[in-house]
């Protein structure tokens, strides 16, 4: 009986270690995982459109990062703060698009804008993350500037 319990416990440990919910193995080795997505920060500086195109060329379904929750924002901010100076901007996938005389924000991956962290909106059309009052917030800036950027894609199953 004791041997059966020992073997059963051993199999349970092996099963749990192989089925980790946040396993990075589904993301390429140089990408980070969070939930169902893979992320990578690129420090080379590009214009917004060039950065978006670069992301789409990295992986199927990849785009500039969309941020859909406070939890995801914290993850993205942590990645950036570990690799980018506080004063540097980082492109995200949000843009303002004119649709039928109405300005509307949209993520480049077409996901809905359900979470916002915008500071001081103005007439510029592209968005960056910038240090503001102790954390990174969204600012809209001129799309032709060159900044670092982060890409994101849905992890393969």
From Swiss-Prot:
Q: Which GO terms describe its cellular component?
A: extracellular region
UniProt KW keywords: Disulfide bond, Hemostasis impairing toxin, Platelet aggregation activating toxin, Secreted, Signal, Toxin
Report where it is expressed, by tissue.
Expressed by the venom gland.
> Among its keywords, does the record have Disulfide bond?
yes
Q: Which cysteines are joined by disulfide bonds?
A: 27-38, 55-151, 126-143
In its keyword annotation, does this UniProt entry include Signal? yes
Tell me, what is one Gene Ontology molecular-function annotation carried by this entry? Answer: toxin activity
As for subcellular location, the record says: Secreted
Give an example GO biological process: blood coagulation
Signal peptide from the UniProt entry: 1-21
- Every copy of the C-type lectin domain together lies at 34-152
Pfam families linked to this entry: Lectin_C
Subunit-level organization: Heterodimer of subunits alpha and beta; disulfide-linked.
Q: What does this protein do?
A: Binds to platelet GPIbalpha (GP1BA) and enhances platelet aggregation at low-shear stress. At high-shear stress, blocks platelet aggregation in a dose-dependent manner.
Which family does the similarity line name?
Belongs to the snaclec family.
**This protein's name:** Snaclec mamushigin subunit alpha
| Origin species | Gloydius blomhoffii
């Amino acid at each position: 009986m004791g041997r059966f319990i020992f073997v059963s416990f051993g199999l349970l440990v092996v099963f749990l270690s192989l089925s980790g919910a946040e396993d990075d193995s589904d993301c390429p080795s140089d990408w980070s995982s969070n939930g169902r997505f893979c992320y990578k920060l690129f420090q080379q500086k590009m214009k917004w459109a060039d950065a978006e195109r670069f992301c789409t060329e990295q992986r199927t379904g990849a785009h500039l990062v969309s941020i859909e929750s406070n939890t995801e924002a914290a993850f993205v901010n942590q990645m950036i703060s570990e690799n980018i100076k506080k004063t540097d901007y980082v492109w995200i996938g949000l843009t303002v698009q004119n649709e039928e005389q109405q300005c509307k924000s949209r993520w480049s991956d077409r996901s809905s804008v359900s979470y916002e962290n915008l500071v001081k909106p103005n007439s510029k059309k592209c968005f960056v993350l910038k240090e503001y009052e102790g954390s990174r917030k969204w600012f809209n800036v001129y799309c032709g500037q060159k900044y670092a950027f982060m890409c994101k894609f849905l992890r393969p199953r």
